[in-house]
Amino acid sequence: MKYQKTVLAAALLAMATTTQAGGLLTNTNQSIAFNRNFARVGAIGIDGVYFNPAGVAFLDQGFHLSLNFQNVYQTREITSTFSVPALANTPYEYPFKLNGGNTTDGSKFYQGKASVPILPSFQVAYNKDKWSFQAGFGLTGGGGKATFNDGLPSFERSVSLLPALINQQLPTFSALLGQNETPATTYSLQSYMSGQQYNFGLQLGVAYKINENLSVFGGARFNYIYNKYQGSITNISANVGGNNQNLYDYFQSKVNALNEKASALQTQAVAAQTQADALRAQANQTTDPTAKAQLLAAADQYAAGAQKATAGAKLVRAGADKLDSSKEKVKDRYLEVSQRGWGITPILGIDYRTGKWNFAARYEFTTKFNIENNTKRDDTKKYENGVNTPNDIPGILALGAQYEVLKNLRVMAGYNHYFDKDARMDNDKQRFLKHNTQEFLAGVEWDINPSVTVSAGGQRTLYGLGDGKYLTDLSFVTSSYSFGFGAKIKVAKNAHLNVAYFFTNYSNFKKEYDGAIEAGQEQVTQPNGTVTMQPKTLATKNTDIFTRTNKVLGVGLDIDF
């Protein structure tokens, strides 16, 4: 079973904003030409520095430059249902109901927003004779900031049980303090997360035109990773005794009251024992049998009272200590951590053209590297400064073809295969994938006249999510369809303006799973007879429905020198 505690640290480390139109960890939208026609691997153009570097060798002699700027907006949406079978037929069976969940099934909707105001990239090539010297730069992963202002299901599940757990303890509080309080009915918390992830990729390489039909490419991309995460879970509260109360302060007030009562009982015990000792001293000094018996009887009563008060003080003090330990679980928590790492991706390419056809392939090797924590604050004690985490970039095999239907009309198709299962991820998460990511791409391009070209394309992305173990509400993707369209407009003799828009329709992925949440401590008798305290857990039934939205608007300029 999945065991859950407070999850702020895991949430922040796992959360990473992505702007991808590609695999699990890859941005392939590296040019505006791509945004209006996704099947670019089989095409020949300056953006081929990324998509079809071997084909760039077939461009005219001289310098070629492409500048690209994109604006990206995403949402991540989760509908979560959560039940506790042990609390069936009570107000706490569907705990999310106590904080705005659906009144029927307790489901609750969560949304995170991510935006990238400007996502830049460029490609440049210098063709001389049969050689093509190339460079490209872009954010090949991440690229923006994601913000979750209202938390996530994994944040809230453990907190949502607090009213039920508090109500279980109210009789104990009443007995120890002599106070009666009405049961807890609702809960609340304030949570904030922001995450930034950047994979800066600088690609260098050389293509060689073997003949007028065949060219090859060899190069590499230097990847520099920078991630930054900040977050907090604060003001965990519940409506207890008719008032919404911060639980850390509430528990502290009970601890103080219990300690005061324990001290008072101990004072009574000392006073009673002192009186008992004094009466025994008097009894030892008297010779009157009747008086001695009366004094000893009174001393025994005081001594018994002292023992009772001492036992009571011990019991109350134990309750205070237990509650003092419990309050640590609801105190405010903060995390601020950044991560850095780097790796080099070797890249090979080939392009072959014959008649009206052009065929191309690109292979990027899996990039092995780690990212290192730079922790400024970690109240969770989960992310030690200097610890390294696997963060491999999956290899890619990209295949493409283009066919010239007419002089002014071209159709394209492509296939991308991401070797996700070969890329090491944190906690070996890649082992939960059923298969590697696959993409199928198609597009069409039409030259309306020598100055205006329009195009459109589609992409089908299939992730190997299996039964959903790979997914969490902290980091998820779902299979999708993307559609893009746009135009290339000649604005000068040697310059073209590219404009494009694309959007992605994500499928809903339903994940059903069992879980367990810590619900305090319980005494457990070991085989050798010793008694130890162990976490007490409650089994849970969980359903998460994941989906996303993605919209990208871009503009770029291609210049030939």
Language model feature labels by segment:
Residues 1-7:
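Bacterial N-terminal signal peptides that target proteins for export
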Residues 22-39, 43-44, 119, 127-561:
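Outer-membrane beta-barrel porins/channels
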Residues 14-19, 450:
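Short hydrophobic alpha-helical membrane-anchoring segments
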Residues 8-13:
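Hydrophobic helical h-region of N-terminal Sec-dependent signal peptides
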Residues 6, 17-144, 502:
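N-terminal, post-signal peptide beta-strand-biased segments of exported outer-membrane/organellar beta-barrel
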